[in-house]
Amino acid sequence: MATKARVMYDFAAEPGNNELTVTEGEIITVTNPNVGGGWLEGKNNKGEQGLVPTDYVEILPNDGKDPFSCGNSVADQAFLDSLTASTAQTNSSSANSNNQVGGGNDPWTAWNAPKPGNWDSSDAWGSRTDGTSAQRNSSANNWDTGFGHPQAYQGPATGDDDEWDEDWDDPKSSSPYFKDSEPAEAGGIQRGNSRAGASSMKLPLNKFPGFAKPGMEQYLLAKQLAKPKEKIAIIVGDYGPMWVYPTSTFDCVVADPRKGSKMYGLKSYIEYQLTPTNTNRSVNHRYKHFDWLYERLLVKFGSAIPIPSLPDKQVTGRFEEEFIKMRMERLQAWMTRMCRHPVVSESEVFQQFLNFRDEKEWKTGKRKAEKDELVGVMIFSTMEPEAPDLDLIEIEQKCDAVGKFTKAMDDGVKELLTVGQEHWKRCTGPLPKEYQKIGKALQSLAAVFSSSGYQGETDLNDAITEAGKTYEEIASLVAEQPKKDLHFLMECNHEYKGFLGCFPDIIGAHKGAIEKVKESDKLVATSKITPQDKQTMVKRVGTMSYALQAEMNHFHSNRIYDYNSVIRLYLEQQVQFYETIAEKLRQALSRFPVM
């Protein structure tokens, strides 16, 4: 009997790597468990076959029964959902396919507001998992750019702070294409890591103190909110509420990946040089430092601002140098996105990450950030909209409009990712082979003609041979073209898929707050709160609404710029591609005289 395995986490195949896209909960047939390098070969129920990471599946008993099918399956599934890894790789799901990326753990399936009636529990406000997978391509030129800044601080010492010595940061792709002789950078895909901050995991918001401790009621019903030192202003601009943008903007160049080691060379890691353009002073960070930053930003701003996950630590199916470049490219895109946000980029924790001067300053800032109390829904207490109060009906309408748009865009992005993946496969697989076949057939025909012994056909035979070689050249062009145009379009869509995956939780919190206000009439009737308390609740939910509208205006502004740029680039490269092919065909044609 064939061995069966249950998929524990969503996994998305990289184009051209002979991998198989699988969805959490899916049962696959193991066709070759001994591939090696942390991989096995499996086949899904559609007959599609490919490589799957061994850490992503659980081998089922010989009777084929799923050990998770008994007991409280709903509760089991809910628990697993809270730990499910969200992918950030090149092929994603369409809205209609559960076998593509995201199909088995769609954050939109449970974004509706929690049911009213339980004022004693704040679990409903923090139980949803955050959206993940933010990857967007930045300029490929950054791959090879080095900045020789001798003053670059090398990051916190790994031997002085135990919490920075955890093994989960030592990177190495578990791809079977890695050489066995490579020095040990801890292998294996880390989806099962228990650390809540691991970037490849979907993080339950109630695991963070900011989402569990300061509940929504604390924000809505507090008699008087403490006056925070930090203020986040919201103004009304030409397109509605908006964040206040800083007078000068900056980016951060991620470059110069270098291998470091610890424990006398027994463990190795990659660290990257970060150079903010506004200071031009470099600092070095390892991946787990980025992971720490992501966790702190999620804890602090995740109720109001979508904070997409870091690119996956593992980029599968790649040799080490290419893997490092790909991860650096995606870290660059993530940092650029954070630098472009007027609230995140100006936050103390983000500035600390980029501008610390020595190890002492780093550790002081790190611990201060971890003790920050203005996290979770309490971030709204720092916001001051310079706008009139909103009534509850308008607040609800604005929330519904955001939910409707982001859900529709999520579906559209997934569809484009699916189509793009299929096109990539055609361009790197069957299509070049067809051109190669035409080329070889033409050259074979020329060889046959040459064997005739007839003296007057040399020019024709040479022309046919060159035409055949032209088609072989076209085959190579077709196979390489996706890297020049489709790659950038796919990366942009992956980044937005990550952003859109964050909105169900944000919208869920807003809808829940609206429900709390609706329930407040009962509390007023029973004298548990005063009418003035209810008005305070409406005002504070209005502040949340202004924050949501400001964030959406920022989102739309970036969306218009990004998609205009990336689709323009795609079309420019396509035009150049077809013009190159046309020129080669013209040259081949010129060898055939008109008779």
UniProtKB/Swiss-Prot annotation:
Modified residues (Phosphotyrosine): Y239
Residue spans of biased composition, Acidic residues class: 159-169
Annotated segments matching region Critical for tubulation activity: 201-213
Secretion signal, residue range per the UniProt entry: none
Residues at which a 1,2-diacyl-sn-glycero-3-phospho-(1D-myo-inositol-4,5-bisphosphate) binds: R286, K288, R327
Keyword Phosphoprotein: yes
Record PTM Phosphoserine, positions in chain: S121, S200
Subcellular location: Cytoplasmic vesicle membrane; Cell membrane; Cytoplasmic vesicle, Clathrin-coated vesicle; Golgi apparatus, trans-Golgi network
Single GO MF descriptor: Arp2/3 complex binding
Database matches in InterPro entries: AH/BAR_dom_sf, PX_dom, PX_dom_sf, SH3-like_dom_sf, SH3_domain, SNX9_BAR, Snx9_fam, SNX9_PX
Location of N6-acetyllysine modifications: K288
A single GO BP: protein-containing complex assembly
SUPFAM superfamilies named in the record: BAR/IMD domain-like (SSF103657), PX domain (SSF64268), SH3-domain (SSF50044)
Record keywords, A-Z: Acetylation, Cell cycle, Cell division, Cell membrane, Cell projection, Cytoplasm, Cytoplasmic vesicle, Endocytosis, Golgi apparatus, Lipid-binding, Membrane, Mitosis, Phosphoprotein, Protein transport, SH3 domain, Transport, Ubl conjugation
PTM statement from Swiss-Prot or TrEMBL: Phosphorylated on tyrosine residues by TNK2. Phosphorylation promotes its activity in the degradation of EGFR.
Tissue: Detected in inner ear vestibula and in the cuticular plate of cochlear hair cells (at protein level).
Region (Disordered): 89-199
Domain notes: The PX domain mediates interaction with membranes enriched in phosphatidylinositol phosphate. Has high affinity for phosphatidylinositol 4,5-bisphosphate, but can also bind to membranes enriched in other phosphatidylinositol phosphates.
Description of how the protein assembles with itself and partners: Homodimer, and homooligomer. Heterodimer with SNX18. Interacts with ITCH. Interacts (via SH3 domain) with TNK2, WASL and ACTR3. Identified in a complex with TNK2 and clathrin heavy chains. Identified in a complex with the AP-2 complex, clathrin and DNM2. Interacts (via SH3 domain) with DNM1 and DNM2. Identified in an oligomeric complex containing DNM1 and SNX9. Interacts with FCHSD1. Interacts with ADAM9 and ADAM15 cytoplasmic tails.
Function (record text): Involved in endocytosis and intracellular vesicle trafficking, both during interphase and at the end of mitosis. Required for efficient progress through mitosis and cytokinesis. Required for normal formation of the cleavage furrow at the end of mitosis. Plays a role in endocytosis via clathrin-coated pits, but also clathrin-independent, actin-dependent fluid-phase endocytosis. Plays a role in macropinocytosis. Promotes internalization of TNFR. Promotes degradation of EGFR after EGF signaling. Stimulates the GTPase activity of DNM1. Promotes DNM1 oligomerization.
The protein's name: Sorting nexin-9
Gene transcribed to yield this protein: Snx9
